[in-house]
Amino acid sequence: QSDLTELLAANNVYTGDLTINSASTLTAAEAQGGKLGIVNGNVYITQSSTAIDAAKLQTVVSKIVTVIGAVSYTHSGTGVTGVNFDKLTGAGSIKLDQEAPVSLSSLVSVGALEIVDDVKITSIDLSALTSVTSFNDGTTANALGGSKVTSIDLGSLPRYDVAAGALTLELSTSGDTTLDLALLTTTDNSTGLVEKLDLTVTGGDDLSLPLFVKGDISATNVKSLVLPKFIYTASTDGTLAVTASKLESI
């Protein structure tokens, strides 16, 4: 144990929980410098006042690359500028409850990912994500997005494996919206077999699922739907329901 402690101390590793909820705790976090590259613990950040300097907080957050435990970020308040975990590549779990667009553009792997639905979230960038245990929008399991979201980028995600075999993605029903699911397959990560994934999508004007094979698809408010490999069976393993109010091509 002593050898491990010395090894962690010699590298860019912070051991223990990192809590930032005031100007003084932010100052303490700044003093850790590069040791925040890997947090061997949890990260708890509450930003609800301009007393916490947003620029300084962003500098600290941008040092965090890997969190062994949980990341919890709460952001609210008039005039309070939110921060992004722009360098975070992996975490045990993440919960974001913020009043601003979500950018986790470097995130590759995470356990449970909860992004609480809020009217001020207009975009969700998970463009590097390749592995996630589950999504949650704060009230519903296996759900991501919200009524004001105009863009969701899951362009690197190859599979969503949950016992429920279901995923719900919600975007705004007005204006132009984009949804990137370019690599989403219905192949089980562990067995390599094609397994059913029920996908419910609201929005995503030009919805393309080039690798999606098996499951029930429900699409609302889409203009075009591309399913080159989808096996339609008109049964419980391959139904297709499309609300045609904006549909131009399928």
Language-model features, listed with the residues they occupy:
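Beta-solenoid repeat scaffold
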Residues: 31, 59-64
